[in-house]
Amino acid sequence: MLDGNRIAIVEEGFEDSELAEPMRALKNAGTKVVLVGSGSQDIYRGKRKKMEIKPNVKADEVSAADFDAIVIPGGYAPDKMRLHQSMIDLVRDAYNSGKIIAAICHGPQLLISADIVQGKRVTSWSSVAIDLRNAGAIWVNEPVVQDGNLITARKPADIPKFNKTIIEALRAIYGTSADT
């Protein structure tokens, strides 16, 4: 089992499955999932209105040292997350500390704002590709891409492989086993 704190960050309009399924996989692997919000509201709703989430904590109340990984769901949320410096700083600091940063679909928009994609192989929803390239990333059309501590995926259909890659990366760091 994987022990420790992993993190999912959330904002209004997240893609429901891109938050729910990684959370479930991480919990099933034995991690403690902490939901971090921007603080813009008390309850965040999924884009498809299937989920309502109350964050455990606000981004300006935590630091990268509190967590082992960050998972960024897609949907409309990443574009809103970019408006909050505390969210950007948390992602940048975690990345610079060698923590796993995993983003799916539109999630890499936040990676652009955190200025951590320069020279990195990444993937995303196809409409985000030009933004990633303009930020200096090497965009590829593959289901899941890992470049160092950065893991990216394209879309909801890629979630099973995305989850497996996150858990394998955490297992490689912490030397424990986990089932997805």
Predicted feature descriptions by range:
Residues 122:
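Anionic-ligand binding patches
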Residues 119:
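Exposed beta-strand and adjacent loop surfaces of beta-rich binding modules
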